[in-house]
């Protein structure tokens, strides 16, 4: 769900999540991609 994704992207990502999603503290825009 997008709202869950926003909540997850609200806080700084851990190193694991950074590598997994290839992002830092930016929202993932898979919907746009």
Curated annotation (Swiss-Prot):
Keywords noted in UniProt: Cytoplasm, Ribonucleoprotein, Ribosomal protein
Record's GO cellular component terms: cytoplasm; large ribosomal subunit
SUPFAM superfamilies for this protein: Translation proteins SH3-like domain
Molecular function via GO: structural constituent of ribosome
Location in or out of the cell: Cytoplasm
Annotated InterPro entries: Rib_uL2_dom2, Ribosomal_uL24_euk/arc, Translation_prot_SH3-like_sf
Pfam families, A to Z: Ribosomal_L26 (PF16906)
Biological process according to GO: translation
Chief place of localization: cytoplasm
Family: Belongs to the universal ribosomal protein uL24 family.
Function: Component of the large ribosomal subunit. The ribosome is a large ribonucleoprotein complex responsible for the synthesis of proteins in the cell.
Subunit composition and interactions: Component of the large ribosomal subunit.
Protein name from the UniProt record: Large ribosomal subunit protein uL24
Species: Xenopus laevis
